Amino acid sequence: MAHSKAKGNDGKITYPPGVKEISDKISKEEMVRRLKMVVKTFMDMDQDSEEEKEQYLNLALHLASDFFLKHPDKDVRLLVACCLADIFRIYAPEAPYTSPDKLKDIFMFISRQLKGLEDTKSPQFNRYFYLLENIAWVKSYNICFELEDSNEIFTQLYRTLFSVINNGHNQKVHMHMVDLMSSIVCEGDTVSQELLDSVLVNLVPAHKNLNKQAYDLAKALLKRTAQAIEPYITNFFNQVLMLGKTSISDLSEHVFDLILELYNIDSHLLLSVLPQLEFKLKSNDNEERLQVVKLLAKMFGAKDSELASQNKTLWQCYLGRFNDIHVPVRLECVKFASHSLVNHPDLAKDLTDYLKVRSHDPEEAIRHDVIVSIVTAAKKDLLLVNDQLLNFVRERTLDKRWRVRKEAMMGLAQIYKKYSLQAEAGKESAKQISWIKDKLLHIYYQNSIDDRLLVERIFAQYMVPHNLETTERMKCLYYLYATLDTNAVKALNEMWKCQNMLRHHVKDLLDLIKKPKTEAGSKAIFSKVMVITRNLPDPGKGQDFLKKFTQVLEDDEKIRGQLEKLVSPTCSCKQAEVCVRDITKKLGNPKQPTNPFLEMIKFLLERIAPVHIDTESISALIKLVNKSIDGTADDEDEGVTTDQAIRAGLELLKVLSFTHPISFHSAETFESLLACLKMDDEKVAEAALQIFKNTGSKIEEDFPHIRSALLPVLQQKAKKGPPRQAKYSIHCIQAIFSSKETQFAQIFEPLHKSLDPGNPEQLITSLVSIGHIAQLAPDQFTAPLKSMVATFVVKDLLMTDRLPGKKTTKLWVSDDEVSTETKVKIQAIKMMVRWLLGMKNNLSKSGNSTLRLLMAILHTDGDLTEHGKLSKPDMSRLRLAAASAIVKLAQEPCYHEIITLEQYQLCALVINDECYQVRQLFAQKIHKGLSRLRLPLEYMAICALCAKDPVKERRAHARQCLVKNINVRREYLKQHAAVSEKLFSLLPEYVVPYTVHLLAHDPDYVKVQDIEQLKDIKECLWFVLEILMSKNENNSHAFIRKMVEYIKQTKDGQNPDDQKMNEKMYTVCDVAMNIIISKSTTYSLESPKDPVLPARFFTQPDKNFSNTKNYLPAELKSFFTPGKPKSTNVLGAVNKPLSSAGKQMLSKSSRMETVSNASSGSNPSSPGKIKGRLDSMELDQSENEDYTMSSPLSGKKSDKRDDSDLLKSELEKPRRGKKQSLIDQDDSLSMDELSKPAQEPKSRTGQRGRKRAAAASDSEEQTWQEKRLKEDLLENEDEQNSPPKKGRRGRPPKSAKMAISKEEPTVTTPKRGRKKAVPVESPPTDEDDHLEISEEQDFENIDQKRKGRGSSRRTPQKSDSTDSLLDTSRPTPQKRRGRPPKTPTVQQKKSHVGRPRKVVSKEPESEEEMEMSQNSPALSEHLSNEDESAEEVVVAPSTGRLRSAKKR
């Protein structure tokens, strides 16, 4: 360097050969030319040329002068920069420049020149590239490490390079830049914050998006220098995160974005930073936590991230934020869960637990995003989500919020279409989600029109996509229908029915619009618009939009024509799509992107457009069924057996024949059905007959060859076919043939002549055919029918027992076990009823005699002849047949009028029959008649007696039916405001007088002032009043009160002079009045109208008589005293409507705030005996709770902990009412001893199960075991006796003398009551004490009130818990109700206490019972949940209560 200085001092500048002096005196062009030659010279020199280095030293110094560094011309500057770069290369490792300021100027100058790299199309680009390459290769900038201002130089260089890099640069440019910058980081002593910022700023999302190449450059640089730069990055984050020094860098606000980017570039850069995030996750600052959660969500969810496995504590800490108090934090966690599920299946287990809690989050948006996350992952790959996660989505289909329900339903639909319909992941995956189709259709039971519309849309787009080719679409529908569960099939049938009904409403509207305008026409149009509106979402807006649409239809003939075509029965699926498209296009407005009017009309068009079924579709469907019949279909591949496919296919065709009859009108279709008709399979032929019945109206005209072939088949089946086929054959003839009289005659005559009791199988078919002919053509065979009924049906069939019945202790057997003779008798009863229904008049008094006959059957328990030949199951069947016949006749006004009150009351008692199935099926008949508004209102009062049913499920179902029938009537009255003349027969509140009258005449109500009997009356009344009083519409509470007051001013219309009966009626009124007063706050208001009492039931009110006396005994009044805590629901969970989803009630532990499950202060004496958990759950229903109430039948695993806690707390409470209980018992015992001295032995048996609660639990259990052993011994002595707690309903006790003579020989239980079935299993063990408490929250207090019953007429305690259908060790001690006494005999007939448990358990949910609830929103989807209900047996451990339920 000294040598350089010496040379420099000479001042002589040596230029390369041919280059003249370069100064400011020459032109720019000349300067450029000379500089190029200098550049060439320096370019060719290398470091070994010592002589040349000395020669050109002064030139090197000259080129670094300000003249060149600040030259205005960029070409000059570029050439000078190239020279300087080569000079640094040649003179390396020393530089010819010694002044730090000069070096700074030079490097700042070179950095500025590098900006020229930006323009890759510039002619000078190669020189700029040469400059970059030179300084990068030589690492020229490393000279600056010694300079004080090195940071400024490096920062300037970095910023320049990051600013010029662009997508025009090749890999070499990129590489040289990285080399240049990395050498500064790796070989320098330090990295300043400014320099670090100049790199990191390119990672900030805003910059990253502006210049992707700069981002890539920074990324490459950081990867290259990871080890060297890591301490400086760590320091930066320490300063910002831990010390809060945000002022040290402008990037402080982007700290979390930078962490994410750096982690993605190289996780080692953040080794010391990540632990700090754990601290930040627990920050008190909501926003800070949110930022950290956003960051970590992305880091954990990134595709190749190993953060969760590498840093488990951070992962666990992050999971904790799923339960953060701040809603946006929880929302963020949930949003990014799908990334973790998709990219890291191993984390699914951890996430499942937290997503479960969040799926019940009070915040709607969070529940919504849980679904989105799970569905997103499932759509990516079904294996990524476990069954538990899918179940969360399933649960949310019943969410309270429509947005959440919609997301869950749509999510499931998309999953189903992808994996089941398109089978993208094979059969196993399709099997895993096979439940989705059923679940989606179950939602059609919901009351919300939005839900129903969405199900219809999902069905048309995802389950059976309407855009599939016809054959493919029908195949899809065929196998879908074959694999749906029963409830889903009913929902689908209901969906088609609703769509068909709406189609007819729109057709009616179009017909009204086409008529000339009149005032009556306008009213009719408005009425029809209202009906249609109810089938659309948001009825308020829907009404306005539909009025507007009606106006459009009046004005626009083209749109009207398209709509007419759409609702025409002959419209094809393709035509329907065109019509919908044309109408929406015409109504649409391009200037109005969101058009609510158009959206509403789209909803309407979607519902009425036949996009699935037309003539071509039916033809394709029948071909598929035929293939299955021929055995050429691939049924097994579709997951169904051939038999299952054929049955389902015909069932499907049968349903479609109701909703789309015209689509069956093709020769090909009818020929295929004719072939089915001739098949041996009864079900196939039966379905074919029903289809002909529904679709055959035009066969005679349009298809004469089908008519000719069909007639002999129908005649043959009517004469000799199975009974159901005979029935449908008669109806087919009625529907198809114009000359039906001739056809009926050809069938009737031979059948009438050949009636033979000796051939019962043939006789059943004959009776069915004749019965239906009599109903359809009553005038054609009047004389022979009357004669036949009188001589043959009554005398030869009903009054004759030919064969002795099979002896059995069962009360019910399956259909195939019923004796043929009994089947004949049942058909004989049905035939008589059909004959009467056909006549529709009682001119011949045949109705009276038939009713007397039916009553005689009920009086005699089904054994009309009283010869004792019939078996118990046969008698049960005949009782049911007789009661059903009366209900059928009551639906015809002319016969309803002649049914006496005594007959009505006896018929009502069948609802409490000893046989479970009789009660169940009779209740269905009542419900069916009421829901169709065919049965008079007094038959709804019969439902009150269901409160006495010992089986919990029956009570629950009865309540559900009652709710539906009340709602049906209220809805009808809303829609038909002008039916005031029918108000008395329709207004549900008018059921109260009938209920009062029925309960006053209840055979169980013997002693007017008996507390226990009045408690039963109270339960029955509240069973009805609870539902009626759930809403106080139009001040109905006051109206009910006024009705009850009016009844007290009248006398019993049945026995007006019977003072005791009148007193009973007034006492029942007082019970009702006390219930109303205790449950209503508005009862005292003035009623808007005066009630009208039914004249048959009550005398006219006596205006001169004011009955203000209170007939209730003082002890009962205390049960209604206001001020005591009282529950608002009778029978607690029993009365809770069944769930549509069969879903278990969610535990509140998943909620942010919790409430107690126990209603410990519940009033034990209130009609609502056992409310408890239901109340607390209902009162605190948050938005995360289900859309429908959950079933009392469903499993309660999540509630078990709460139940056990509840049990403990109940046991620890001081017992109330104990003293009163003891006194009551003593009183009742002494009364019995005075009045019935002969009944002492009974009292001993009657004590069973009534031990005082004060005794210790051990001794109680011991006593219990002793009692059970004694009981078993007694049962072995006399197989099925039961303790005579009360005589059979309606049968007065035999004389005391007779009773004494019977009881003297033994101290065993007298035989007056129903027999008790022998237990199948051993007595209960200690385990019973640990069964969960599902209904009785206040069981102790209830028991105390009940225990003081000692006399033989008292009933054993009613325990809902012991009514579980599957508890096979405990027979249902349900006694038969209300048969008045037969002629006294020396020994009363032995009989069952109730149906054996084995029978009960087999048929708790028959198919017919399910049909009863077809339109109800309360249908359970899980049979498994019903099975789980078997575990819900309640045993009060402290009471030693009898196993049997209270007999009714």
UniProtKB/Swiss-Prot annotation:
Q: Which InterPro entries match?
A: ARM-like (IPR011989), ARM-type_fold (IPR016024), AT_hook_DNA-bd_motif (IPR017956), Pds5 (IPR039776)
Q: Which GO terms describe its biological process?
A: cell division; DNA repair; mitotic sister chromatid cohesion; negative regulation of cell population proliferation
Stretches the record annotates as Disordered: 1141-1448
Q: Which GO terms describe its molecular function?
A: DNA binding
Keywords (A to Z) from UniProt: Cell cycle, Cell division, Mitosis, Nucleus, Phosphoprotein, Repeat
Query: Does the UniProt entry include the keyword Cell division?
Result: yes
Q: Where are the HEAT repeats?
A: 383-419
Q: Is Phosphoprotein among this UniProt entry's keywords?
A: yes
Q: What residue spans carry the Polar residues bias annotation?
A: 1141-1155
Q: Which domain of life is it from?
A: Eukaryota
Modification comment: Phosphorylated in mitotic cells.
Which PANTHER family does this entry report, sorted A to Z?
Answer: ANDROGEN INDUCED INHIBITOR OF PROLIFERATION AS3 / PDS5-RELATED, SISTER CHROMATID COHESION PROTEIN PDS5 HOMOLOG B
Family the entry assigns: Belongs to the PDS5 family.
Please describe what this protein does: Plays a role in androgen-induced proliferative arrest. Required for maintenance of sister chromatid cohesion during mitosis.
What is the protein's quaternary organization? Interacts with the cohesin complex.
Name of this protein: Sister chromatid cohesion protein PDS5 homolog B-A
Q: Which organism is it from?
A: Xenopus laevis
Q: Which gene encodes it?
A: pds5b-a
